[in-house]
């Protein structure tokens, strides 16, 4: 493997799995105090756009990294929205 590919894989791994600790904590505790809904909506819009880009370019590294990111970050947004709705009911 060349240096460019290794650098890309290194970056993809850490940016993808950066959401794992927050996702695990939120799923376990259901505590979403301090979570920004706007940030997660904007972020997930970007992730979905990257998935579309990966499909159009047949770039499986981009595609896989962003699919994993989607599955790590989306539960945080969903739980946050559920909790906010419960507060207002």
UniProtKB/Swiss-Prot annotation:
Keywords: Cell membrane, Membrane, Sugar transport, Transmembrane, Transmembrane helix, Transport. Changing residue 50 to F: No effect on sucrose transporter activity. The chain crosses the membrane at residues 4-27, 35-55, 60-82. GO terms for molecular function: sugar transmembrane transporter activity. The keyword Ribosomal protein does not apply. Changing residue 57 to A: Increases sucrose transporter activity. It is a multi-pass membrane protein. Its main location: membrane. Changing residue 66 to A: Impairs sucrose transporter activity. Residues 7-59 form the PQ-loop domain. The homodimer mediates transmembrane sugar transport down a concentration gradient. Transport is probably effected by rocking-type movements, where a cargo-binding cavity opens first on one and then on the other side of the membrane. This is Sugar transporter SemiSWEET. It comes from Escherichia coli (strain UMEA 3162-1).
